Structures are given as C-alpha cells and as structure tokens.
C-alpha cells in the first residue's frame, strides 16, 4: 500500500484479488483481527466449534445492526469495514465460527476470540484486545508482573481446541493489542505437533513478554513464525520485551492514536 494507506484503502484497492492470485498477508490478518472486535454475542450460530457449521462472512455482515458495534476501546465503528470486506472477492468466501466471550471477575480474565476458515484451506484464530471493562484493564496490568495471566492460558487452549477441529488446515494466529500478545503466547505454548502446522502468528502492536520468556527454548522454537508490527509512535507494542523481528509501519494518526488499527 502507499504511505498512510488504511485497511479500508486496502480492501478497495486489493479486494478484487482472491487468495489464489495473491496469497494471505499481514494486512489480511489485520482486517480479520479488526472484525474480531465486533460484538457477535447475540449470534448463537457463530459460537459453534464445528467448522462444518461455520457461517459465511457476508451472511454475518448482513445481519449486523448498531447494537453490534465493536467491544474494544476505539471510538470507531468497525461494522463498515466488515461490510466492505464481505463485498470483496477476497473475503466473501471466508467463514466464521468459534466465537467466544469469557469474562471472570474472580480470575480477572477477559477473553474474546473468533476463528476464520480461509479460502486457501487454512485456519486463522483471532484474539480480541482489551475491552472497556475493569477486569480487562486489570488483566493488562497483571501481564506486566505475572508469568502468565488467565487469558494467555485460555488462548493456548482455545487454539488447540479449534485447530483439533480442523486437522487438515494450516494454522495462523493473530490479534491486535492484547490480542496480539495472546496470539504470540498461544504460538509459543501449543503442543509441538501443532506448532509444526503453524504458518504464522501475528502480533499487531501488542505487548511482548518477560526476559525469561523471550530467552526460553519454547520461544526460540517458534520465533521465526512470530511477526510483530508496530506503528512509528508505538506505546503498547514496545511494552515488555520482543526478541523476534518486527516491522515499523506508517499510520495516518499521531501519537497514542496510532494504536488504532484502522489507521
């Protein structure tokens, strides 16, 4: 994309190219990670973990209303992005399943995820970032000094569960903000046979890990599959440590607002 192009621009410019002509890339991951912020809680059919019952992305987009606006911290509405994606040749055959919203005040856990079956016969597991709840913020704070928080542990278990339901598909994992950290955590902690199926894990401006984690054998085992993207003025994405390669990208926003994935 040109300098300061957004994901909406990407859909308009490249949406006519199916994955068979131009393979899945990091911007496709970001598009689907942004969609994972939308409030799908009233869509019971998306909660199935059976991939044969997955719902086409355009069908879900057609049912969205104002009450389904995204659950994250952004003031933007992500529904127009999903509707635009649903109209493109590139995304219209994507299917969705495995939506879950898990909130536990006692465990101090906020966990949201949804999975996508892609037309290239791969699977993308996508984790949402922090919502507006106090528990979500407390869990973010806990990440700075606990070796693991409940959402991280749940992310690895969720990935294993969803991947087991799709044994013939290559695996991708992604997320934005805390969701990006969860994606990397899951990649590091899933069983070795599943790591062999892992094509990539995308951390979009999410925190890193403790020094002990990035210096561990578990981390090194998948380090070449971890892809981290941060904006020029990243704040969240430079928290804690990253030992994997990362790319600095342009943003149409300034300062902390560069954390907004639509920019």
Over which residues does each language-model region extend?
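Alpha/beta hydrolase fold serine-hydrolase catalytic domain that processes acyl esters and thioesters
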Residues: 1-26, 34-44, 51-113, 118-123, ...
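Gly/Ala-rich beta-loop-alpha elbow adjacent to hydrolase catalytic centers
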Residues: 174-179, 183
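Short glycine-enriched nucleophile-adjacent loop
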Residues: 183-192
């Amino acid at each position: 994309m040109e300098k300061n192009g957004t994901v909406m621009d990407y859909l308009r410019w490249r949406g006519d190219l199916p994955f068979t002509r131009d393979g899945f890339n990091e911007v496709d991951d970001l598009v689907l990670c942004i969609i994972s912020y939308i409030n799908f809680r009233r869509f019971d059919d998306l909660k199935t973990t059976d991939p044969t019952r997955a719902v086409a992305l355009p069908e879900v987009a057609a049912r969205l209303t104002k009450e389904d606006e995204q659950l994250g911290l952004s003031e933007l509405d992500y529904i127009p992005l999903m509707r635009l994606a649903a109209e493109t040749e590139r995304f219209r055959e994507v299917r969705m399943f495995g939506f879950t919203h898990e909130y536990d005040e006692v465990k101090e856990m906020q966990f949201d995820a949804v999975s996508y079956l892609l037309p290239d016969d791969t699977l993308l597991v996508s984790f949402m970032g922090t919502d507006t709840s106090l528990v979500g913020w407390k869990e973010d704070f806990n990440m700075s000094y606990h070796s693991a928080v409940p959402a991280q542990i749940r992310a690895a278990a969720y990935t294993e569960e969803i991947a087991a339901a799709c044994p013939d598909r290559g695996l991708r994992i992604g997320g934005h903000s805390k969701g990006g950290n969860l994606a990397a955590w899951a990649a590091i902690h899933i069983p070795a046979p599943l790591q062999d199926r892992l094509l990539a894990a995308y951390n979009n401006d999410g925190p890193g890990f403790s020094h002990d984690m990035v210096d561990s054998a578990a981390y090194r085992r998948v380090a070449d599959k971890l892809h981290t993207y941060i904006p020029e003025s990243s704040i969240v994405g430079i928290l804690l440590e990253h030992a994997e390669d990362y790319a600095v990208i342009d943003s149409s926003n300034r300062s902390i607002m560069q954390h907004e994935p639509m920019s």
